[in-house]
Amino acid sequence: EGRLRLDEPVSRYIPNFATARVAVTTDSGRALVPVHRAVTIRQLLTQTAGLSYGTEPLIRDDYRAAGLGPAAGYGWYLADKAEPICATMDRLGTLPLAAQPGEAWIYGYATDVLGCVVERASGVALDRFFQQRIFGPLRMRDSWFFPPAPEAGRLTAVYAVTPEGTLVRAPDGPLGQGDYIVGPRQDFSGGAGLVSTAGDYARFLQMLLNGGELDGARILSPATVALMTAPAVDSLYYTPGMAFSLGFEVLQNPGEAGEYGSIGRYGWAGAY
């Protein structure tokens, strides 16, 4: 539709990023210096925007004060919040970056920022955008940010293994049983928080394998899927034999990476 350009500045959608600063170490402690270049959509997709989860000592206190990051006690993700995602991302845009944009690969809130970009570019809340553009056309009927109340009983319990090898139920709460998914809420995070089934997720993956189409529903063009899965960052990426694309880790050299797989295999690990 031409609404987004990969190399346009994020500040077009989140103005606070126009005055982004980077935290650097000095003889007296810390300084905040201007960015050398604007943070772009492409950098968000490749995790090279300089955004982290606020765990670095130089910026940890800033994130804690803003109620963001593990230092604030919220874990890495945002699905437990009661404010719209763009309110959270507006606040994030005022915090120091961990590195200059385009100069380091740092995994962090970049994909969450993209969720706000999608909302503002489309004029539609992210949950409705996913439903209208992805879940509905792909007939993914069991995928939500916050499941309807009648579906809550279908959620699996989480278990853990003790050091002694005993299987125990994880404690109740947002980190143990993920009860932050009990809605309704409005912080639809671009980086985490969806609930789905194996069957629904398989349909999404098959769409990607088919070049962006499944059962007559065209979600992405073949050219877009090819662009998304082509190596975009290699020298900055931390794993030998791997590169990072527009959202995926891509296997380039199985021997160097030390794992089985075909060249071009792409994906990313989940987290609970």
Model segments located where?
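Short, surface-exposed loop or secondary-structure junction motifs
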Residues: 15, 19-260
